[in-house]
Amino acid sequence: MMESGAGFVAMEERISPGSFFQYPLSGFRASPNRSPCPPSDRERYLTELLQERQKLGPFLQVMPNCCRLLNHEIRRVSSFPDLDRYEHGSPFRSLGQPTNGKLDLEGWSMMQAEENCHLQRASPFRGPSPVGWIGMPGLPNPPIVKKVIRLDVPVDKYPSYNFVGRILGPRGNSLKRVELATHCRVFIRGRGSVKDTVKEEKLKGKPGYEHLCEPLHVLIEAELPEDIINSRLEHAVHFLESLLKPMDESMDHYKREQLKELAALNGTLREESPSPSLSPCLSPSMSPFNSKRAKTEI
C-alpha cells in the first residue's frame, strides 16, 4: 500500500513506467567522428548511454575511467542547453549546479562527487559517503534496497496550472536531468497524467492504468545501497517539491530557461531583448506552463 506525503514505501517489484508520460529526448548534435543518423537513432543511442551510466553507478570507484569516458560520450551526443544563466530561484541550485558555470554531466550528480575523485565537484548537499560500499576489503557491502515516495500534486488548489509540463520540461528533458542528477526514477501518475484526455478516459480501468482513477501524483523510485538511498531520495523530493509550488512568472527563472530551451528546440530562439520581460519571441502557445497542456513532439 502506497503512503501519501513524503513517507518511504518499500516496493517488492519495480514500477514499470507508463508510456503515456515518457517523452524521448531530442535535439542531439551530430559528432564530427560519426556519420549523421536519424534523430530516432541518436535518441536511442543516448538512451542506451544513460542506461549504461545508471548501471555503472555501483562501480564508480572500481572503474572510474569507464565512468568518466561514458560521461564524456553522453555530453558529446547530447545537446542540453546552456544553463549557466540560471539565477537564484532556479531549483537546479539545490542539485549542486555551480552558480556561474554550466550544468554538465560531470557535475549533475552530487553523489557522483562523493564516489568518483575524477568527477569531484563542490555541492551544497552531501549524502553519506559510500566508502566501504564496494571495493574496500574487510568492510561489508550494504544491501541494495528499493524505496518509493509519493508526492501529491496540488491540482485542487491550482486547477489551471500545468504541473505536468513543468516537471517534464521541453520534450521531457527537464525530467531526464532530474533523474540523472538524483539517480532516482520519476513517474507521473493519476488523473491528468495522460497527455490526450480522450485516450486517458479509454485507458481508465484497464490493467496497468488503475492509477488513472487516483488524484494526480508523482512517484519517486530509487534502488540503491541502503546507506545512501535516503539521501538521494531526499534530494529528489526537495527538487520536485519546489516544482509543485507555483510562483509569479516574473520570478520564475526555471520556467524562463525552459521556455528558452523550447524555443531553441523549435528553432525560434532569437537574441535576447534588452527588455527584462520574458523572451518576447516566444508565443504563449509554446509555453509548457499554459493551462492547456503544451503539445510535445515525439
Curated annotation (Swiss-Prot):
Subcellular location as annotated: Nucleus
Keywords, sorted A to Z: Nucleus, Phosphoprotein, RNA-binding
KH domain residues: 152-219
Modified residues (Phosphoserine): S273, S287
UniProt GO cellular component terms: nucleus
SUPFAM superfamilies for this protein: Eukaryotic type KH-domain (KH-domain type I)
Pfam families named among the record's database cross-references: KH-I_KHDC4-BBP, STAR_dimer
Region (Disordered): 266-298
Paired cysteines (S-S): none
Protein name: KH domain-containing protein At1g09660/At1g09670
Organism this protein belongs to: Arabidopsis thaliana
Lineage: Eukaryota, Viridiplantae, Streptophyta, Embryophyta, Tracheophyta
